[in-house]
Amino acid sequence: MNNIDTTRHVDVFSPDAFGKRRIDVIGAGASGSRIVLALAKLGLENIHVFDFDIVEAHNIANQVFSQADIGRPKVEALRDIVKAHTGLEITIYNERVDGSQKLGDVVFLLTDTMSSRQEIWKKAIRYKVATKLMIETRMGVDQGRVYVVNPTRSAQVRGWEETLYDDDVAEVSACGSTISVGPTAEYLSGLAVWQLIRWLNIETGKSSDGVSDTLDHEILFCLRPPTILTRQFDQLI
């Protein structure tokens, strides 16, 4: 049963229109933990979360966890946080995703390394008809990227794969950065969840606020100074 009152946003995003579609969130770190909580606050119930880490002291400043969660598996702590905030239950898996798992309609790919993302993509997402949308985020100190891909569309597959890089690059520029700033993660996570909102409204044609939209596949932002750039892979030659 949906225990959260969604009347304040239902004209922009209706959980009933989303229905029983399954969402898989792979990684419950700086962006993943926030994304899971935001999805639940939208009223979505079929949320599945994968992570194999425990909450450590350095996670408190940039993730949704509290001091009381230190030492607990992230997925267990996140389950309790979501329940306390929304009354909703999420499904959790305290395990590493290796590509053997069957994933659902929407996948948020948010693991710590680019190599693990590529492995999961190749084995469990790429050209899998069960998954209609993949959203991936990358974060630096004051900048980030959001990728929004239909993994069965060849132009989008090619466009996303051309953005990939090795872990040694990621360590200094994006998701592997040793510096992680909470407000950057907040901005990135909200931007990622908004792409799900946009996707559903485009898919259903039921955006009751009357806004016409076309999905972007790459969104780049910088916060110093505030700048945002977008690109659509379907328009690539």
Q: Which residues are covered by each model-predicted region?
A:
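Glycine-rich phosphate-binding loop and adjoining beta1-alpha1-beta2 segment
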Residues: 46-86
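N-terminal charged helix/coil linker that caps or initiates catalytic domains
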Residues: 1-23, 158
